[in-house]
Amino acid sequence: MKKIFLSAILAGAVIAFGGTVFLSVENTVVGSIFFTIGLFVVCTRGLHLFTGKVCYVFDNDMAYAKTLPVIWLGNLAGTSLIALAEKCTRLVSLSARAQGICELKLSEPLLGAFILAVFCNVMIYIGVEGYRSNPHELGKYLALFFGVCVFILCGFEHCVANMYYFAMGGAWSGRAVLYLLVMTVGNAVGGVAGPVARKVLSR
């Protein structure tokens, strides 16, 4: 479990780096493209990212499910550590943009945040499953690329990315925690929707 937690911290860190790139550029299309570095490293290095691992909870035993809270906490630690470190550098200037993003996210009705989180992890599943199952190398990476770019450009809610934005924007509050939990549940629902649909259609 310790190795899983450490792997989850690293996963949170690379997602935070993706978020850093997104905050650093004005063009959201460019930002979405380079945000893909996070999921790319997670998949190629086998790191533990909650939004990816939760997709396969029904394909594994209870021991697998018990690792998910550990992974979530590790992701939170990783994103928070990167945000804290960045605030000790000139990258602290990114906090203003992060604050604006957080204000927008926290102004969404809870139902809306949940739905956007469901949609997000449908895209994550498409990306991760495409990487896992596509026999062609180019196809693997295109799956990651399109899955991430679509969820970002559509404004869908990714709980781990939001951990970073909340930390960088100094937006943590009871309301932010509530929203993050709702988004986490939405990500879980969206993540399992793909595998469940695949099983139903294959009968």
What is the meaning of each model-derived region?
Residues 1-203:
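Alpha-helical transmembrane segments and their helix-helix packing motifs
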